[in-house]
């Protein structure tokens, strides 16, 4: 009836460190602003005519950007051969830069999509 278990001490310690070192240091608002800045930088470099970003007003934006891609699975597979992971979900390619990504990294993603937006590497 009762099962012995232990507390996930290591997970609690990891969460505490993450909250202290990241969220307390930078603040959630600053992290979110950096993510949106990187998204905008990515969109400035995205030029493939078949890729259409699903855009929302600033009030309704999130850290996830959805791109319409005619060959969704092929596009995701082509990106994965370049160690760029974007997941196909709900008919869109999910692009989600993190606050620690660099401008160069999102430019690399945009360049790869510009080359392979049709699903070809």
Residue spans of the language-model regions?
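Pyridoxal 5′-phosphate
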Residues: 1-121
């Amino acid at each position: 009836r009762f099962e012995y278990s232990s507390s996930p001490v290591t997970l609690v310690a990891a969460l505490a460190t993450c909250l202290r070192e990241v969220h307390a240091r930078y603040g959630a608002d600053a992290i979110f602003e950096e993510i949106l800045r990187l998204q905008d930088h990515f969109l400035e470099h995205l030029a493939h005519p078949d890729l259409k970003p699903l855009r929302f007003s600033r009030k309704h934006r999130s850290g996830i950007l959805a791109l319409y891609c005619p060959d969704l699975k092929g596009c995701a597979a082509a990106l994965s051969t370049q160690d760029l992971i974007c997941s196909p979900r709900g008919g869109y390619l999910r692009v989600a830069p993190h606050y620690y990504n660099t401008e160069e990294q999102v430019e690399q993603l945009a360049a790869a999509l510009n080359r392979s937006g049709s699903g070809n590497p």
